[in-house]
Amino acid sequence: MVQSKEVNRDQNREKVAAPLRVSRSLYTPEQRIKRDKSAWTWIQGILAPIQFLVFLISLVLVLRFLATGEGQNIAIWSIVIKTATLYTIMVTGCIWEKVVFDCYLFAPAFFWEDVFSMLVLALHTAYLLALATDALSIEQLMYLALAAYATYVVNAAQFIRKLRIARLDHATQQAAMKQATTSGMEVPA
């Protein structure tokens, strides 16, 4: 009797957990076509590594200033340039999302990445506002920039992870289609 209850409990757990294991593709076939045909996909692919390079240079300049007190102006301006690249990639990313998913932000496929992007934008914007109004000391500005940069790194990792999952999912789908066609099974359109 005890063993029977345990088996039933395990079966119920499997039924509850089953929907959690179902993998949904990041893109529908139509969205994948839109993504592949859009010039905005290429633009995002160019801007992302540029922004990362600007981030790395700025990070070094900010850390150098905090460690030595040298290079204050270049550190300040590097953060402004990093923020401008962030705004640029956010605007072009919104356009890309509109083209592929038919909404400018918070498409289900990238909902949490977009939510976290809002924090990244808020911290970078807070830096610009504090810089313009002298609301913070130079050291406080640099630490605010580092907080903004930390959120940027997390957000970039979110996007990289999501795109890697999409690439692996697509490869799995392609392999399954190839397997189905070579075994003579009919592949749905």
Named regions from a protein language model:
Residues 28-41:
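Cytosolic juxtamembrane amphipathic/interface segments immediately preceding
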Residues 1-3, 7, 182-189:
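Long, non-globular segments of proteins
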Residues 166-188:
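Short, highly charged, low-complexity non-transmembrane loops/tails of multi-pass membrane proteins
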Residues 2-3, 12-22, 43-66, 72-100, ...:
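Hydrophobic cores of alpha-helical transmembrane segments in multi-pass integral membrane proteins
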Residues 20-30:
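Short alpha-helical hairpin
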Residues 67-73, 174, 180:
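Charge-rich, acidic-biased intrinsically disordered regions
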